[in-house]
Amino acid sequence: MDIKKGDLVLVISGKDKGKRGKVISVLPSEEKVIVEGVNIVKKHTRPNAKMRQGGIIEKPAPLYRCKVMLICPHCNQPTRIKHTFLEDGRKVRVCSKCKEIIDRV
């Protein structure tokens, strides 16, 4: 997957369109990501050993990765990602707009 934990992303479709957030976790087998502060759902819980008191908990739910776009840390714009190899053979992610290296893969 092109998106990794800790990346800043922009939601491009759905009820939270236009919101930005940091990726909390990535679920590669399902091709989903969990973004901080986006797609918040309410979960009703019963009392158990961990939580003495039940109640309604708000937590972020996963989004399909096609609904988010990476924000380049250099040009601060949503961008697609290209992959290139450095001279020493390492594979890196590159911003399509500003051609800067985003980070090591």
Swiss-Prot record:
Residues making up the signal peptide according to the UniProt record: none
Any Pfam family hit: KOW
GO function term, MF aspect, one: rRNA binding
UniProt keyword Hydrolase, yes or no: no
Coiled-coil positions: none
Protein family according to the UniProt entry: Belongs to the universal ribosomal protein uL24 family.
Assembly mode: Part of the 50S ribosomal subunit.
Protein name, per record: Large ribosomal subunit protein uL24
Species the sequence originates in: Dictyoglomus thermophilum (strain ATCC 35947 / DSM 3960 / H-6-12)
